[in-house]
Amino acid sequence: MRESQDAAGAHGWNRVGSTATKWFTGAPFGVQSHRFDISAVYPNWKKFSTFTEAPYSTRYSTQVSHIGPGTYSSKETCFSKKKLMKEVDTGWAKAQEATRLTQLPHFQYQAIMKEKRLKEQKLGPGSYNLKDFLEQLREKPCSTRGLLSSGEVRFRGLTGNYYPGPGNYGEKGNPYTKLEENAWNRSHSEGLMCRMSNKPHPRPHQGSGLGPGTYFFKSDLETYVARSVGTRGPYDTFSGDRSKPLPYGHYSMQKKKPRELMNFKSFVEELNSHHNKKHGVFSKLPRNPKTPTERIYWANLSQCPRTLATSGPSFWLPQEKKCKPVNQPPFLLTSKGSGAKACQMIMGSWNPVGVGRYLNTWLMETKDRRQRYRSLFLSGSKRYLSDLARDMLMQERITPFTKGKCPPTVDYNSDPTP
């Protein structure tokens, strides 16, 4: 039964008319198609030249698969023999035609020469017009917009803030409560005889608890008489005499202050005032000071000389150098064997701390850490055999510091020493 189904499935697969040949029997999962064939599902998204889909592509399997190096002719290209012969044959004709055209005069030769002669004749004072910088600026293309014009609409619309302004917020922090209530009232409006406000209905009248004859009501006449009424009549516009100037209002006059005697300061009070306190007092400062009191003269050394006690650049006297006999180093050397520069060059030490020193530009990886005979450079060089005791000491210092510390190297493969 299974074999009959497989045969029927294979026969059905061939009946579909697919370009690819099915090399298996049976239909996995009830589908008569290849496992990796997605051309029917995504025909436009099918990626060519892939491992699983390229063999099932009709174009890449039959039309393009035979193309390769040596499988096509060069007749279709621009380097074919026919194309090259055609170009070579027409070269001399094109060159001859170009030579003939260069020998022909221009069709506006006379007009051009006439214009050149007129320009040469017009040269002279007053015969030409030179444009100044203002005319050149006017001729330049410019914009009608100013420096601050951005070309954008200032108020295009709402910028995202749809909330009411200050003072328009509703109940419980919801600004739309009042708007919703108004919309509800408009959509559910009551009749003309109904109330239009949201006030509650008045409560029914209840008794006050007072007995009969224990209270009385004022009549309308008593209420009218008890009202507070002004004493001015309907024609009394201003209180007081109308002949006097108006004390207030639009046509009022300025009130003048009463004239009084002014208190002037006496001579003694003005002399003892705060402003005249220093008048007539002898100054404690010298009349001709060594340095001017104005700060503007302090930058000039001739007008403001510096004191000898002042410290700073160029404020001390240089010491006189004494000529000392110098013992020349041997071996025709011109530099000392000791010093800061020699210590840096030989010992590899670089101390960045100090006046005139610079930062350490050496990398720690490239720094030479080998042990050197530092004792040779602690003092100046002297001639040999000038001091025998010192020469013996120097001979001991030349001895390496590892002498006698390293174990002897023994070759156990060789014969022992007799």
UniProtKB/Swiss-Prot annotation:
Annotated tissue distribution: Sperm.
Disulfide-bond pairs as recorded: none
Name of this protein: Ciliary microtubule-associated protein 2
UniProt organism field: Homo sapiens (Human)
Domain of life where this protein originates: Eukaryota
Gene: CIMAP2
